[in-house]
Amino acid sequence: MLKVESISKDYREFKLREISFDVREGEHFIILGPSGSGKTVLLEIIAGIISPDRGRILLRGEDITGLPPEKRNFSYIPQNYALFPHMTVFDNIAFGLKLRKIPRKEVARKVREVAESLGIDHLLHRKPRTLSGGEQQRVAIARALVVKPELLLMDEPFANLDVQTKSKLIREMKRWRKEFGFTAIHVTHSFEEALSLGDRVGIMLRGRLVQVGDVRDVFSKPKSEEVARFLGFENIIEGVANGRILKVGDLRIELPREVWGKVRVGIRPEDITIFMEGVKTSARNVFKARVEGIEDLGALVKLTLNLGGIILRAFITRSSLIELGIREGEEVYASFKASAIHVFP
């Protein structure tokens, strides 16, 4: 449906370099990256707000690179929602329909239908300043969907919401997608949004799209250490592999497949299980470790573990920390399955 070809742009402090990807009909495509990686600039280039220095954008095979935003039939939801403060919710939602010269009765019908679907039909007489963040977001989404856009562009759509409102809107976004059948490009730094909503994801780091693929594949099989570290592989270790065994100092770690020679592997902290004593487990990799650090992260606690000179980090729940009675300096057992190990190419 949409094809982005070799887009480059120097814009203020941002530099985009040779960005290429495609978006399929009916897909929810996530652009995932940290703040400052150029995600919003890329989205605004696709929207037609900013012109690229090089490259082109094709919609159904037609070059739309020079087409103004109003001719693209895309709906763009910026991070601040950009609702008109002097207009009611009804008039905000109706704005795009009125620009298209839709008859008044048809405008009223379409606005009420989309407002009912998004659960805001009781707010149509209100002004944006009287709404909560979640309600404002629903209004912005309703305004975007009511015109039946070719493509929905969303810039950090849930960034300004509290955790509960965000979780609710993510669940409802799945329902709205089924109901309205839209195609979306969704910019975010949130792993939760990517995993919950995305079909495919493009990882954007320092102005480059460094990996594109199915969301689950990218998260489980990052193609570089840079991508892996961004996606939460805090434990990256180097050793010498002899078939299914990786030798790291005095440790012998079972690998998910045969590998030979010097390699580097990654293990997520959440894939390491902690026991206070040796137990029978399906995990082949079980090692005695000393707890060298305990970091409180809220619901989770990060443990820094020393396995014979090899430092690993593991996540456990706060309740598990209390139940197990883990303290700094104590010995524990750390286990992880061979299948949890990612071998870097």
Swiss-Prot record:
State any GO BP term from the record.
molybdate ion transport
PROSITE patterns to which the protein is assigned, alphabetical: ABC_TRANSPORTER_1 (PS00211), ABC_TRANSPORTER_2 (PS50893), MOP (PS51866)
Q: Where does ATP bind?
A: 33-40
Keywords carried by this UniProt record: ATP-binding, Cell membrane, Membrane, Molybdenum, Nucleotide-binding, Translocase, Transport
Q: How does it sit in the membrane?
A: Peripheral membrane protein
Chief location bin = membrane
Q: Where is the Mop domain?
A: 280-345
Q: Which SMART domains match?
A: AAA
Note one Pfam family from the annotation. ABC_tran
Question: What residue stretch is flagged as signal peptide?
Answer: none
Residues of the ABC transporter domain? 2-231
Reactions it catalyzes:
tungstate(in) + ATP + H2O = tungstate(out) + ADP + phosphate + H(+)
Location(s), subcellular: Cell membrane
A GO MF term: ATP binding
What GO cellular component entries does it have? plasma membrane
For this chain, the family text in UniProt reads: Belongs to the ABC transporter superfamily. Sulfate/tungstate importer (TC 3.A.1.6) family.
Q: What does this protein do?
A: Part of the ABC transporter complex WtpABC involved in molybdate/tungstate import. Responsible for energy coupling to the transport system.
The record describes its quaternary structure and partners as: The complex is composed of two ATP-binding proteins (WtpC), two transmembrane proteins (WtpB) and a solute-binding protein (WtpA).
Could you identify this protein by its name?
Molybdate/tungstate import ATP-binding protein WtpC
Q: Which organism is it from?
A: Pyrococcus horikoshii (strain ATCC 700860 / DSM 12428 / JCM 9974 / NBRC 100139 / OT-3)
